[in-house]
C-alpha cells in the first residue's frame, strides 16, 4: 500500500487524524519519526487508543525514535547494536520506500543554529538548494539566516524523499506565515516552484507580533499557514500560479468550522493567483499606487541603481535605526 510519513510526529496528532479521516479503511503504511522520548511514547499510546476504539484497521502503524535529519536517515551506516542505531536503521528503511504523502508540523526556531555538525552533513548539503546563487551570496547576509531553521530542513528532507519516489506524491506541512512572502525564503519557494506540479496555500493564523489581533489555533505569536504541494510523476514539474484561501482572520470557532468542512466545499473557496516573478511570493500583494511607488529610491540596491545607501551591513535593528529600516 501507500506509505504516509510524518517526519516530526510529536505526540502523533497528525497521524491520528489520518486514521480518523479514512472512512474506507485503506491499506497503507503510516509512519512517524520523533526525536524526543516522551512525545514518542505518547504517540504510540495515542495510536493504540485509536486502534482500541476504532478497530485495528487495514493499515500498519510504525512510530520510531529517530532524528529524521541525521545522516543515518539517508543511508549512512549506523551501529544497530544500540537502541538508537536500530531505530534509525528501521526508520531509514521506511523513509527509503516510495512515499505517497508527507504531513507534519515541523519545529521552527531561528534563535540558534541546529543540526550543523558532521552528523548532519547530508541535509546541510541539500540546503544549498534553498540558498541564493553563489554569485550573489555575501557574508552576514540576512536572507541566508533561515537556512538552519529546522522547519526549512524538514521541508528539504521531505522534498528529497518525495522526489525520489516513482509515483504521484503530496507534501502538506504547517509553516510560518512569513514563509509565504518573506525574502528570506524566496529561494526555497523557487525550489518548490521548480520541483512540484501544483500548490494550495492556506494562512491559518496571522502574525500576532505585528500588533494585529489574531485568534490563533497554534500556540505561537508567529503566524502559521498550511502549504499543500502535489507532484505528478512522469510529467515535467513546475508551476507559475497558486491556489489561495485565507482563514487567518476568523475566530477560532470559525477556523475550526472552515477546516472541518467537506473537501468539495473547501476547494470551491480557493482563488487562483499568478506568482509575481520579482518576489516569488505565495501570498497576494495588496493593491497600491505603483507609479507613485516607483518615484522613490530603495534603501539599497545590488544592481547599481539609484539608492539611499550605496553600501549596507546586516545587523540588529535598534530604536535609533528603526526610522531607516522599518
What spans do the regions from the language model cover?
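SAM-dependent methyltransferase catalytic region
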Residues: 1-201
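Sequence-level detector for compositionally biased, low-complexity segments
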Residues: 97, 114-116, 141, 160-326
Amino acid at each position: 500500500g501507500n506509505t504516509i510519513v510524518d517526519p516530526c510526529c510529536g505526540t502523533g496528532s497528525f497521524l491520528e487524524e489520518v486514521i480518523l479521516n479514512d472512512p474506507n479503511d485503506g491499506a497503507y503504511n503510516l509512519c512517524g519519526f520523533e526525536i524526543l522520548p516522551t512525545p514518542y511514547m505518547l504517540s504510540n499510546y495515542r495510536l493504540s487508543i485509536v486502534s482500541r476504539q476504532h478497530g485495528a484497521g487495514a493499515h500498519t502503524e510504525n512510530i520510531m525514535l529517530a532524528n529524521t535529519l541525521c545522516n543515518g536517515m539517508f543511508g549512512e551506516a549506523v551501529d544497530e547494536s544500540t537502541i538508537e542505531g536500530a531505530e534509525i536503521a528501521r526508520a531509514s528503511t521506511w523513509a527509503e520506500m516510495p512515499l505517497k504523502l508527507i504531513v507534519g508540523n515541523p519545529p521552527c526556531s531561528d534563535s540558534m543554529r541546529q543540526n550543523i555538525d558532521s552528523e548532519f552533513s547530508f541535509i546541510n548539503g541539500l540546503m544549498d538548494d534553498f540558498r541564493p546563487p553563489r554569485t550573489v551570496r555575501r557574508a552576514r547576509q540576512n536572507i541566508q539566516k533561515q537556512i538552519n531553521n529546522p522547519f526549512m530542513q524538514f521541508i528539504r528532507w521531505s522534498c528529497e524523499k518525495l522526489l525520489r519516489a516513482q509515483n504521484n506524491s503530496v507534501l502538506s506541512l504547517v509553516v510560518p506565515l512569513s514563509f509565504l512572502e518573506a525574502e528570506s525564503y524566496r529561494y526555497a519557494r523557487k525550489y518548490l516552484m521548480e520541483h512540484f506540479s501544483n500548490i494550495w496555500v492556506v494562512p491559518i493564523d496571522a502574525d500576532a507580533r505585528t500588533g494585529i489581533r489574531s485568534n490563533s489555533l497554534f500556540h505561537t505569536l508567529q503566524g502559521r499557514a498550511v502549504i499543500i504541494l502535489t507532484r505528478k510523476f512522469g510529467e515535467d514539474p513546475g508551476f507559475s500560479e497558486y491556489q489561495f484561501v485565507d482563514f487567518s482572520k476568523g475566530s477560532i470557532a470559525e477556523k475550526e468550522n472552515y477546516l472541518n468542512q467537506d473537501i468539495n466545499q473547501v476547494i470551491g473557496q480557493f482563488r487562483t493567483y499568478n506568482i509575481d516573478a520579482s518576489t516569488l511570493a505565495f501570498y497576494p500583494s495588496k493593491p497600491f499606487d505603483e507609479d507613485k511607488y516607483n518615484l522613490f529610491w530603495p534603501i539599497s540596491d545590488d544592481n547599481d541603481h539609484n539608492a539611499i545607501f550605496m553600501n549596507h551591513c546586516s545587523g540588529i535593528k535598534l530604536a535609533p535605526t528603526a526610522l531607516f529600516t522599518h
